[in-house]
């Protein structure tokens, strides 16, 4: 089985040196992602594409799914290679491969050719298209927007039959740009902004300012791990959690009501800048959008920026909320954001939309900055791959089991799409489906006399959700790992 990976167009217009560097990094990223599927996958880079080959036909779906989520890839072609003698032989093989698909359909033939031949690409298109039209009476040629496009590639003496095409997410390969630190809250905005910087070639680390206890932190870890696992798993990244409750308490006590929002954001920027400097990160990423809330006016954003010399990137600055939610839906973070626990430590009755620098600095003069230094120095830094292990250490009473008792119910908390693609079947075991994003609201409705074994494929989501349910007072929860 072979896949041909086509590069994002912006990569192809780079200088030769830059283009080769980008292709080399992309090939390395692909290897890092696919090595989790097996050792028998070969990745070979060329000037204008990257080949992925495997002898295991069963890995095709998983390989394709992984490739569609790696930044830097424009599209993926699943192909079959054959030898050919002449144009008529090309037609015969195209008819064999595509004939059954063209009955009662409109079609066109598209050919790309490399090498020296006695025919042109257009001549092959006309010859193959004419032959298919003659041999399949119910098929009709339609050059614009046909039902089926017969894609052929000719590389020297090899005919490449394109069996399927899958769209990638585009962008630049992760690692071609410098690292950034995303201020993630688990909501719509921060998840989308993190994805946009990953797609632009940055390795994204995560910084979370905890205002609402462990339940909020668990939810945010789920979002960060999901984003990394889905789009950025080719690289190691950090998840930094800062306990910001002491800072909030100091603001509530020392800062005027109308200035609290801007002061809190300035404190977050200062703390994030210290974290970024500690790990050699060049910029901070936020999900702020112009005018969305009172602290996000131009005047207030300028004052927030002035709190630090670190570059602050705001990829969503001109996006409206509806567009942001649509993007969250496309990348799969919408359900996380909708069910994320909401915590607001600083609530101003009349927040300023046009803060004055002198007033802000006067309010901050009352703030004990030793508190800020302390919470930053005590920030928890964890490799995002170790989130599951960290959860296990935090809550030792969450039991992991491999067998079932008579009263046990296996609770499949994977998303509906994952359950449909890879249904769970176990003989003699009661299995219920309850996606992770519905657990917090619907778990309490389940029969209390049963013990529920939470299951997900990697064990990360199930452990985090079990931790959350345990903190909510449920003692009939375990984690199932086959």
Swiss-Prot record:
This is tRNA sulfurtransferase. SUPFAM superfamilies: Adenine nucleotide alpha hydrolases-like, Rhodanese/Cell cycle control phosphatase, THUMP domain-like. Residues 404-482 form the Rhodanese domain. It is an enzyme of class 2 (transferase). The gene is thiI. Its EC number is 2.8.1.4. Gene3D superfamilies: 3.30.2130.30, HUPs, Rhodanese-like domain. Belongs to the ThiI family. It catalyses: [ThiI sulfur-carrier protein]-S-sulfanyl-L-cysteine + a uridine in tRNA + 2 reduced [2Fe-2S]-[ferredoxin] + ATP + H(+) = [ThiI sulfur-carrier protein]-L-cysteine + a 4-thiouridine in tRNA + 2 oxidized [2Fe-2S]-[ferredoxin] + AMP + diphosphate; [ThiS sulfur-carrier protein]-C-terminal Gly-Gly-AMP + S-sulfanyl-L-cysteinyl-[cysteine desulfurase] + AH2 = [ThiS sulfur-carrier protein]-C-terminal-Gly-aminoethanethioate + L-cysteinyl-[cysteine desulfurase] + A + AMP + 2 H(+). Catalyzes the ATP-dependent transfer of a sulfur to tRNA to produce 4-thiouridine in position 8 of tRNAs, which functions as a near-UV photosensor. Also catalyzes the transfer of sulfur to the sulfur carrier protein ThiS, forming ThiS-thiocarboxylate. This is a step in the synthesis of thiazole, in the thiamine biosynthesis pathway. The sulfur is donated as persulfide by IscS. Transmembrane segments: none annotated. Residues 61-165 form the THUMP domain. It is found in: Cytoplasm. PROSITE patterns: RHODANESE_3 (PS50206), THUMP (PS51165). ATP binds at residues 183-184, 265, 287, 296. GO terms for cellular component: cytosol. Keywords: ATP-binding, Cytoplasm, Disulfide bond, Nucleotide-binding, Redox-active center, RNA-binding, Thiamine biosynthesis, Transferase, tRNA-binding. It comes from Photorhabdus laumondii subsp. laumondii (strain DSM 15139 / CIP 105565 / TT01) (Photorhabdus luminescens subsp. laumondii). Disulfide bonds join 344-456. Pathway: Cofactor biosynthesis; thiamine diphosphate biosynthesis.
């Amino acid at each position: 089985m072979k896949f041909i990976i086509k590069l994002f167009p912006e990569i192809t217009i780079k200088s030769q040196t830059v283009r080769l560097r980008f292709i080399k990094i992309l090939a390395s990223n692909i290897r890092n992602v696919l090595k989790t599927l097996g050792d028998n996958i070969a990745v070979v880079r060329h000037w204008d594409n990257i080949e992925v080959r495997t002898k295991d036909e069963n890995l095709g779906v998983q390989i394709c799914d992984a490739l569609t989520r790696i930044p830097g890839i424009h599209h993926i072609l699943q192909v079959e290679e054959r030898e050919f003698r002449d144009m008529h032989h090309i037609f015969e093989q195209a008819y064999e491969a595509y004939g059954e698909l063209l009955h009662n359909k409109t079609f066109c033939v598209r050919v790309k050719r490399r090498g020296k031949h006695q025919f042109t690409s257009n001549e092959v298109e006309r010859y193959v298209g004419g032959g298919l039209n003659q041999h399949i009476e119910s098929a009709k040629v339609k050059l614009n927007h046909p039902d089926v496009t017969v894609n052929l590639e000719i590389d020297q003496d090899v005919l490449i039959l394109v069996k399927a095409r899958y769209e990638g997410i585009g962008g630049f390969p992760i690692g071609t740009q410098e690292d950034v630190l995303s201020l993630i809250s688990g909501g719509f905005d921060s998840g989308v902004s993190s994805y946009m910087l990953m797609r632009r070639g940055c390795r994204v680390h995560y910084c979370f300012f905890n205002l609402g206890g462990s339940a909020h932190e668990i939810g945010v870890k789920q979002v960060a791990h999901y984003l990394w696992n889905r789009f950025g798993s080719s690289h190691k990244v950090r998840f930094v959690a800062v306990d910001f409750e002491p800072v909030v308490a100091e603001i509530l006590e020392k800062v005027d009501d109308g200035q609290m929002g801007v002061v809190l954001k300035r404190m977050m920027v200062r703390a994030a800048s210290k974290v970024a400097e500690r790990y050699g990160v060049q910029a901070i990423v936020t999900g702020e959008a112009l005018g969305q809330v009172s602290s996000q006016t131009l005047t207030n954003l300028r004052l927030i920026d002035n709190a630090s010399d670190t570059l602050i990137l705001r990829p969503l600055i001109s996006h409206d909320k509806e567009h942001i939610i649509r993007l969250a839906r496309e990348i799969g973070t919408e359900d996380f954001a909708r069910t994320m626990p909401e915590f607001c430590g600083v609530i101003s009755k009349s927040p300023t939309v046009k803060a004055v620098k002198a007033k802000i600095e006067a309010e901050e003069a009352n703030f004990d900055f030793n508190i800020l230094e302390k919470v930053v120095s005590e920030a928890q830094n964890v490799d995002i791959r170790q989130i599951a292990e960290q959860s296990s250490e935090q809550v030792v009473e969450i039991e992991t089991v491999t067998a079932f008792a008579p009263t046990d119910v296996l609770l499949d908390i994977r998303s509906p799409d994952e359950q449909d693609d890879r249904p769970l079947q176990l003989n003699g075991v009661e299995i219920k489906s309850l996606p992770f994003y519905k657990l917090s609201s619907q778990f309490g409705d389940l029969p209390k006399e049963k013990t529920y074994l939470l299951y997900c494929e990697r064990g990360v989501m199930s452990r985090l959700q079990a931790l959350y349910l345990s903190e909510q007072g449920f003692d009939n929860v375990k984690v199932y790992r086959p």
